[in-house]
Amino acid sequence: VAICNPLLYTISMPKSLCMKLVAGSYLGGVLNSLTQTCCLLPLPFCGPNVINHYFCDTNPLLKLTCSDGRLNELLLVTFNGTISMTVLLIIVISYVYILVSILSIRSARGRHKAFSTCASHLLTVTLFYVPAGLSHMQPGSKYSLDMEKVTAVFYTLLV
């Protein structure tokens, strides 16, 4: 809305809708975190309880359990996959609308200006979501703590 119809932004995005979107995002994040934490807490941990990672994340913690963590891995992939795919779908749909709006601009200079503005945003979104996706969307059989540590450093440096 902000790019396609900038003058209509305050009408089509009232403060109440923005608040609902923020509340929904926070609620989804809390629900995901609580589910992962509640499913991880009853698992027994044995041996050296030193996490070989920079962050106390779910995947490194699952590597320390003595029991079968397949249910937790399934929950992790399901929740993170659903969240990631929903966000990706929303982003792709919004970029399609933006692309259609940009292509309807008559002047070449205006199209170039709009594309250059959107290109930096697209690069930022890509640099934000690709490392997060690589870190959280690996199935347990392909999961590598070393690869996730590299991804975590890359993500931390970018963000």
Curated annotation (Swiss-Prot):
Checking Pfam families in the record gives:
7tm_4
Q: Does the keyword Transmembrane helix apply?
A: yes
Q: Which InterPro entries match?
A: GPCR_Rhodpsn_7TM, Olfact_rcpt
Residue intervals annotated with topology Cytoplasmic: 1-16, 104-116
Cellular compartments per GO CC: plasma membrane
Q: Which residues are glycosylated?
A: 80
> What's the protein called, per UniProt?
Olfactory receptor-like protein COR8
Q: Which organism is it from?
A: Gallus gallus
Question: Gene for this protein?
Answer: COR8
